[in-house]
Structure formats: structure tokens, C-alpha cells
Amino acid sequence: MDSTMTNYMGQENLPPALKLINDKSYQYSTHKHNIETSNDGTLHSYTIVLSREPLESPTSYNKYQKNVEPVQKENQKPKDLNKMTAGPHIAVKNSSGLVSQISSTTSSERKRRTLARPSSSSESDLKVGNIQQSNQYFTLPSVMKPSALSTEDPKKVIVQSNTSSSSMSDASSKKSLPTYTYLSGHTTGSARYVTMVNVKFLLLHCDVLQRRAQSMFTDEFPSDCRLEEVVINFHQLCCRQLLDQNFNPRLSYCIGELNYSDSKPVSANDMSKTLAQLATTQSIAQLSIIVDVTEKNMKLK
């Protein structure tokens, strides 16, 4: 291996990359060029040492290289970084103000970064006050009788629905329910939960050949949605099956899965009740509604 070393004064002889140094106090440099030849080819290694003061004899340079070489070998083994301890071979006294391209790993770099675990949301954050109300039912007409369809402006209907829902009494229910509905644009601040109820809507009707048929619709509604609004929403979906018939059905419902034997008839007072009031529980998950508009229960126009 051939090696040459040359001392320079000034920054004119520095490589272009080192000329970008803004500190003009480094006016002394030592350039060492190593040439190593093997069967694979020739390897050229360049080492430049900068200093603010004149460098001493070449022996001091060789001593500095001897001190930093173990550090360079340690840096080539990333697995041993955590086992490195401060020793004589790492701490190099820079009494002459030398700056080298070879640097040892600092203690801060050897520390492992700990990832902060994401904070999991608790159930207390799922209160109604923090839930954004859905607008998917805002266009539903709000009427007192299910047989009459509203043609009013949706904006006016929303205002009327908010007014009527806020004045609804809770005396018919043993449990205290919130005074707002899913149509409200704001919350009352009460710490109550609103669950989504899976509603199955079974329509019994007659086809064009006057044969008895049935159609099934499924949707989800908040537990504080009134039964009347649920029926009106489904009525808009089943207009094709009704043809030109008046919608004067016989209604019945059952909590949970669809069961004809366990179904209960719907009275006029039940139409103004919410799904939670109808099931007498806030934890209602499924409701089935049977709507019979067959020939015995319908009136042709």
C-alpha cells in the first residue's frame, strides 16, 4: 500500500466540497492519499485534516490516526453500538483544534428512541355531546298522520320538526329521555347515549296481477327517532310496490327478529313515540315493522 502526505496552508487546495466551510480560521490542512492495489482493482483513499494552527510533525498526525481508527471500526458494526463505553480509544483530545471527517457516535445518538403509544379513546368520549348528528334524514317530511305526504319546503319542515320534538312530553315513559331528536341541529349537553337501531320494514302488498306479495327493506335509525318518521321514510322507498294505492296500512311491530306471532299492533299514540320509548329500553338494537296494505286493508283511488 502506497501512502503520500502533504501539508498545505490556506483553503485554496481544499476539495470543492470542503470549500463551502464558512469558517475561514481553518487555514492549515494535511492531505493524505493511500493507494491499495488488489486483484479486484485499485482503491484510492483520501483523508484531509483541517486545523486552525500549524500542524506538528507527521508523528502527531499518525498518533491521531491511531486513536480514531478503533472508533471507525466500531462504527462499521452497528450491532455493537449499544455496548460501546467511553474509553481512551474514543475520547480524543482536540488540543490543536483539529476537525476530522471521522467522528465517533455521541451518547445521544446511541439512545434508542421510544415511540409514544397512541392514546386510546375511552367510552366516556362517546357521549352524545361529542357525537356529530347525521343529516341523512333531514329531508324527511314531518307530519302527524302517516297517510298524508308532505310537499312543503324541506327547510320549513325541519323547523317545524324541531319545534314539535322539543315540546314532546316524557310523561309516558318511566325512563327520562333526551328532549331532542335526531333532526335537531344541536345537543342539549346531557350525558346520554344514542344508539343506532337496525329496522326491518316488511311490506305486504298486491302485485299487478292482484297476487299477494311482500317486499323487505332494511335501514338504520337513531334510537331517539320517532316511529312516524321511520314509516314515512320507508313509504318513500316502497312507492313502486304500492302502484297507485293509498297508503292506509295496518301496522304492527316486534322487538328483535321478525316474528308474526309476537308482533304487536301499532296504535295512534305509538306513532309519536321514539324507537327507545316503543321498546321501553335505550339498548334496543333491532326492530321489525310489518305493514299490511293488501286488498282487505287498502282503498283504491
Swiss-Prot record:
Disordered: region residues: 56-126, 149-173
Low complexity: compositionally biased ranges: 161-173
Highest taxon listed in the record's lineage: Eukaryota
Residue spans of biased composition, Basic and acidic residues class: 71-82
InterPro entries the record matches: DUF508 (IPR007465)
Pfam family, one: DUF508
Biased composition regions of type Polar residues, renumbered to the chain: 93-102
UniProt protein name: Uncharacterized protein C38C10.3
Species the sequence originates in: Caenorhabditis elegans
Organism classification: Eukaryota, Metazoa, Ecdysozoa, Nematoda, Chromadorea
